[in-house]
Swiss-Prot record:
Lineage, opening ranks: Eukaryota, Metazoa, Chordata, Craniata, Vertebrata
Summary of subunit composition and partner proteins: Homodimer.
Active site: K142
Listed Pfam families: TAL_FSA
Any one GO molecular function term: transaldolase activity
Protein name from the UniProt record: Transaldolase
Species whose genome carries this gene: Bos taurus
Amino acid sequence: MSGSPVKRQRMENALDQLKQFTTVVADTGDFHAIDEYKPQDATTNPSLILAAAQMPTYQELVEEAIAYGRKLGGSQEEQITNAIDKLFVLFGAEILKKIPGRVSTEVDARLSFDKDAMVARARRLIELYKEAGISKERILIKLSSTWEGIQAGKELEEHHGIRCNMTLLFSFAQAVACAEAGVTLISPFVGRILDWHVANTDKKSYETQEDPGVKSVTKIYNYYKKFGYKTIVMGASFRNTGEIKALAGCDFLTISPQLLGELLKDHSKLTPVLSAKAAQASDLEKIQLDEKAFRWLHNEDRMAVEKLSDGIRRFAADAVKLERMLRERMFSAENGK
């Protein structure tokens, strides 16, 4: 006999409990941080790649990307662009060695208002993965959830069989447009919505169930499930484990290594909060959005307008920093020959 149930080992950790009803994704470019948490998928963005590219442990990848950019030749700008694309793919390829599922690789945020340029850059990234022996089935291309980005996602999915992850998603309008575009996955942000409300309203703290980021993702999840959209809802950008627990049951959640570590040490009981069944009871009504209606509805949400703009600027700024870093490495070395 193994003894009474009371004497059993303490409850399994919150991360393992969460994995029973939500697909857990690691939000990091630091692939050495992934092993411990055994996520299904992983997501990267320009800021995470910039941070990882500055770590001593990843300098071989940076050197390989620089060599690739040089080998293809062309102008300095072309060499740097090719080196950056290669760097993103090198990190993605290493991450894929650690996970069974897919990695998300982001298109340069400076293209966020140029549909055709986003499509071209996405296809280029997929081509680079193919050169590395990785099929497009294991890649999600991340695009900003501007109107142009959403239409780029629609084109990539329908005409090129390239799966997309729509990021920087803050408004219900963005979520509805993504569902109608038939993209594979959306990443509605939680923590950045909370940040905005703390900074711009008199209320400085929230109970988890009243957290505006949690409420936003809950509404989007319920809408998608109620109306039968196949697009995966992946909550992103968390400030604490309370937000994660409040969204247990969501299709996917992408979580930083720091918060994955906290969940690993947490042995409190976790129960699913979101479910497709409960979503059927929500009082949401179906809406359809053409471009004009999308722009109006999104523009009515001050938080979403400000956070989308801010998010694009931040990712663009980190892309510029990455370019500067590679330019110094590529061309100062060349000048010193």
